A protein has these predicted regions:
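N-terminal secretory signal peptides that target proteins for export/translocation
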Residues: 1-15
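Sec-dependent N-terminal signal peptides
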Residues: 19-26
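Boundary at the C-terminal end of the N-terminal hydrophobic targeting segment
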Residues: 35-37
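Early extracytoplasmic/domain-onset interaction patches
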Residues: 39-72
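Structured domain cores in non-transmembrane regions
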Residues: 69-148
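Mature, soluble, non-transmembrane domains
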Residues: 113-231
Length: 231
């Protein structure tokens, strides 16, 4: 699909065509324009805020679970690679995902007391199969560790073009207890705030076909916000 960035990278470009095939097939059956609307896949997200013994935040440990359909396609593609087993394919895929995400700031924005924070480079990561889902785990460091006491840290994780939707892990229609966690000091209140996009932006996303790219930054308006407020 021309012009659509995907974190899985160029090594799996063929996978993008599956979204087109699925959309066209369903659309021809249901005659629904919504099938072609963005987003075309999703990631279930969970985040652990990493702090040291002094209660200083050093980064975010993120776990991404790709949606079941996309996961199935990825596993089938990897198993067809000759001379390589699934785990070897996943190891290479993890490297590809990391390299492609680095060009997009790992789909992550972090603010402390409203001030944007510079991010470090990801060196710890892994891709694996878990319960039939492609799961990518990585530690995203802050370029400068930040004390949390008396401050508020917020983050958003989103695909800038909104081709993929990123949502925190849910349970009974609300963020699960494991969607955002922080162990140790300081004492903080954790919450996940829902997105509240302008109706015009919702319509804009709905009008985008599967082979079209939303303007950069569109995904920010649909992003949930993780908030850590510390005493």
């Amino acid at each position: 699909v021309t012009g659509v960035f995907h974190p899985l990278g160029s090594s799996l470009n063929k996978l993008r065509s599956y979204w087109v095939v699925l959309a066209i097939g369903v659309c021809s059956t249901l005659n629904s324009s919504l099938v072609l609307a963005h987003p075309h896949g999703w990631i279930d997200l969970s985040v652990r805020v990493i702090t040291n013994d002094e209660g200083i935040a050093t980064g975010l440990h993120q776990t991404w679970r790709m949606d079941p359909f996309y996961s199935l396609v990825v596993f089938e593609e990897l198993q067809q690679v000759q001379g390589s087993n699934l785990q070897e394919g996943l190891d290479q895929l993890g490297s590809d995902i990391r390299d492609n995400l680095s060009q997009q700031h790992y789909f992550t924005e972090i603010r402390v007391n409203g001030e944007p924070q510079a991010l470090g480079e990801v060196s710890e990561y892994t891709a694996l199969e878990r319960d039939g889902r492609l799961t990518f785990m990585f530690i995203l460091p802050l370029a400068t560790p930040q004390p949390l006491a008396g401050r508020m840290l917020e983050y958003q994780v989103f695909d800038p073009t909104y081709y993929i939707e990123v949502v925190h892990e849910e349970e009974d229609g609300a963020p699960s207890e494991q969607a955002l966690i922080l162990y140790g000091e300081p004492d903080c209140r954790l919450s996940v705030l829902p997105a509240d996009p302008d109706p015009e932006l919702v319509m804009q996303a709905a009008l985008l076909d599967v082979d079209e790219t939303g303007e950069s930054g569109l995904g920010r308006h649909f992003a949930e916000t993780g908030r850590i407020e510390c005493d």
